[in-house]
A protein has these predicted regions:
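Alpha-helical transmembrane segments and their helix-helix packing motifs
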Residues: 3-7, 14-16, 21-214
Length: 214
């Protein structure tokens, strides 16, 4: 009986040793496939590689590089954010030109207009022009808000689209050109917002005109 048990033990050991030289089956070595949820969690922002990719920034919008460190896109509609970005960017593009032009001596006739860009604010308040500017800006905001509300309700309007299309980019066949122009506008908008902030800061710090270098 003892010899039989020993024989079985030796046979089992030999089988185990032999199995080490046999190639494992596919089923045994098949790696676990990552779930889509794990893949999404692993995705990183293109602009901020140390932060996760915002769920609402999928790259479909022009200039979308996943930059949202504060997380605004998680609780504010992305179309509203793009509308605000384009509006502020367009205003700053005009402001950069107007700010520099004023300090280069281009202004309306009259002594009341012969002031620097920085001094123009106080001059407008003193003459009563500032309330008029506020009134007109408020009127334009009220009118444009109708289109924004309709957009958020699903009208299909693209953010920042007010029907101004002098190059006929909306016509069939111009899709690629339209995408190119949309990207360029966003890039210029962002640059103008930074540039205007820098120009105002430099003008105040150095109390000088263009190019605001002291």
């Amino acid at each position: 009986m003892v010899n039989t048990v020993n024989s079985l033990a030796v046979a089992a050991a030999c089988c185990a040793s032999a199995s080490a030289f046999v190639a494992p089956t596919t089923q045994l070595v098949r790696p676990a496939q990552p779930s889509s949820g794990m893949t999404m969690q692993a995705a990183k922002s293109k602009s901020l590689p140390f932060m996760p990719q915002p769920a609402t920034l999928d790259g479909s919008m022009a200039g979308d590089v996943g930059f949202d460190p504060v997380g605004f896109s998680s609780w504010i509609p992305i179309d509203f954010l793009r509308e605000a970005e384009l509006k502020h960017g367009r205003i700053c593009q005009l402001a950069v030109v107007g700010f520099a032009a004023t300090d280069l001596g281009l202004h309306l006739p009259g002594a009341e207009h012969a002031v620097s860009s920085i001094a123009a604010h106080d001059a407008a308040v003193a003459t009563g022009a500032m309330p008029q500017i506020l009134l007109w800006v408020s009127a334009f905001e009220a009118i444009s808000s109708v289109a924004v509300v309709q957009m958020l309700e699903g009208s299909g309007r693209a953010p920042g689209d007010f029907g101004f299309d002098p190059y006929n980019l909306s016509k069939p066949g111009n899709e690629k050109k339209k995408e190119d122009f949309e990207l360029k506008e966003v890039v210029h908008c962002r640059l103008a917002m930074l540039a205007f902030s820098g120009m105002v800061t430099q003008a105040v710090l150095y109390n000088s005109g263009f190019p605001y270098t002291g």
